[in-house]
Design a protein with these regions (language model features):
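Extracytoplasmic gate region of multi-pass secondary transporters
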Residues: 34-36, 219-275, 334, 361-369
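C-terminal ends and interior cores of transmembrane alpha-helices
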Residues: 88-101, 296-310
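Cytoplasmic helix-loop-helix junction between adjacent transmembrane helices
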Residues: 109-148
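Juxtamembrane intracellular "pre-TM" segments in multi-pass secondary transporters
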Residues: 2-9, 193-226
């Protein structure tokens, strides 16, 4: 009987974590939506590449700094109320974004989407620390990351189809209505309370949470681990989430559908690779080896995609899939962040790790847009205002412009591989 109760408890835990992961997948779809709507958004809001990068990256201006308070709030208040409220905020932000032609109002909508999304990933990991065994954390972070990329794949393929048929406004409004339904599902399905066989690290006071944050933030290993995650994740935060589809269309001559498919194959590789990397890391009780291997191979693949001319569509698709498969080792950093920190501050530790990881999107998405405009200006001698002529959007930038603007991605990934030599091996063991 006791064994059966344990199995039932474990099943409930996985289902609850799955609901949280569903919200993460939903917010991920909202995150990458601008990448499949580039032309429509630039026409609607009259944007240059710099402006397009800025309006997308506003998401991160809320998402990144919110990670620290989100971690403390998760430890203090639990995931149920916070994830439900966060989903509702995403819905409001989406409606605000689609209901205006003003850049700043739209940017405010993206900010709200980022604000709500900030709770998603950390919320799932917090649910895992409450409901699942500690030795499953790397696998849970991998599975959660995988479900997030399912949202990205849906965005790259189905959103592109709906945008073509219905327009971007109706398409995003449909996602907002789905978010309303999801809000009720989260409230009814998620439970915070720890069960009989598992103890949660809930922080009893905000003051204690701030003390824990101070301890964690002073741990240099947390920053090394987070910086690895940030740099090896650049193919997602900078390339696939925003600039991947425009690059594949402009530089390799792929159609909108072909570019979306190739981009989604990167997410598919990550979807399959993240839980496998987590399982492999848990099984061998080592973190650094899969992190080093994944970052090293992914760096080579990124260089080939960016700097090898004459790639046909099939080659690009295979390379994108393999890139996603290998850099999915990034998902391990959340387990490492937990294992480098005391158990009562699990949410805070993983939130700080996630904040560092997502800095890449906040800082570098708009930088790519600026570098594209700057490279075009140097090459053509034309004013950046030319970029506002929508008919010229797909003629402005050539492969050289993109190679210059995206060069820091493989450089950053190479640095990530080197950082593993400065990271402590936790052997998949977390302090209590």
């Amino acid at each position: 009987m006791l064994s059966e109760n344990r199995r039932n408890y474990a099943l409930i835990g996985w289902l609850i974590c799955g609901l949280g992961a569903l919200f993460y997948s939903y917010e991920y779809l909202l995150r990458i939506a601008p990448s499949v709507m580039e032309t429509a958004l630039r026409e609607h809001f009259n944007l240059s590449a710099t402006g397009f990068g800025n309006i997308s990256s506003v998401y991160y201006y809320a998402y990144v700094p919110m990670q620290l308070p989100v971690g403390i709030m998760m430890d203090r208040y639990g995931p149920r109320r916070l994830l439900t409220f966060a989903c509702l905020i995403c819905v409001i932000g989406t409606f605000l974004f689609t209901g205006t032609t003003d850049f700043w109002v739209a940017a405010s909508g993206r900010f709200l989407v980022g604000l709500g999304s900030a709770f998603a990933f950390v919320g799932v990991l917090k649910l895992a620390t409450i409901w699942l065994p500690e030795n499953k954390l790397a696998m849970v972070s991998g599975l959660t990351s995988a479900l997030g990329t399912v949202g990205a794949m849906l965005g790259d393929n189905f959103l592109e189809i709906f945008v073509h048929r219905l327009g971007w406004i109706k398409t995003l409004n449909m996602t907002a209505f789905f978010g309303i339904v999801l809000t009720f599902i989260l409230w009814l399905g998620i439970h915070d309370k720890k069960g009989r066989y598992r103890q949660s690290g809930t922080v009893s006071s905000f003051k204690k949470g701030m003390i824990d944050l101070g301890i964690i933030a002073r741990n240099k290993q947390i920053w090394v681990n987070g910086l690895f995650g940030c740099l090896v994740y650049l193919p997602t935060t900078v390339f696939a989430e925003l600039w991947g589809i425009p690059y594949l269309r402009h530089a390799h001559g792929l159609s909108a559908h072909g570019a979306g498919l190739a981009n989604s194959l990167l997410f598919l590789g990550f979807t399959l690779g993240a839980p496998l990397m987590g399982y492999f890391s848990d099984r061998i009780a080592r973190r650094k080896l899969p992190m080093l291997l994944g970052a090293s191979v992914a760096t080579v693949l990124m260089l080939v995609i960016l700097y090898f001319p004459g790639l046909n569509e099939s080659s690009v698709q295979i390379l994108m899939f393999l890139l996603g498969l290998f850099y999915s080792a990034q998902a391990i950093v959340f387990a490492v962040g937990r294992e480098l920190s005391p158990g009562e501050a699990a949410g805070t530790a993983m939130a700080l790790t996630n904040m560092i990881v997502m800095l890449g999107g906040m800082l570098l998405q708009p930088l790519v847009g600026y570098l594209l405009d700057f490279s075009y200006s140097l090459r053509s001698g034309a004013s950046l205002s030319t970029a506002l002529v929508v008919e010229n959007v797909h003629k402005l930038y050539n492969m050289t412009d993109y190679r210059i603007a995206l060069a820091f991605i493989p450089i950053g990934m190479c640095i990530a591989a080197l950082l593993t030599f400065f990271l402590k091996e936790t052997h998949a063991h977390a302090p209590k």
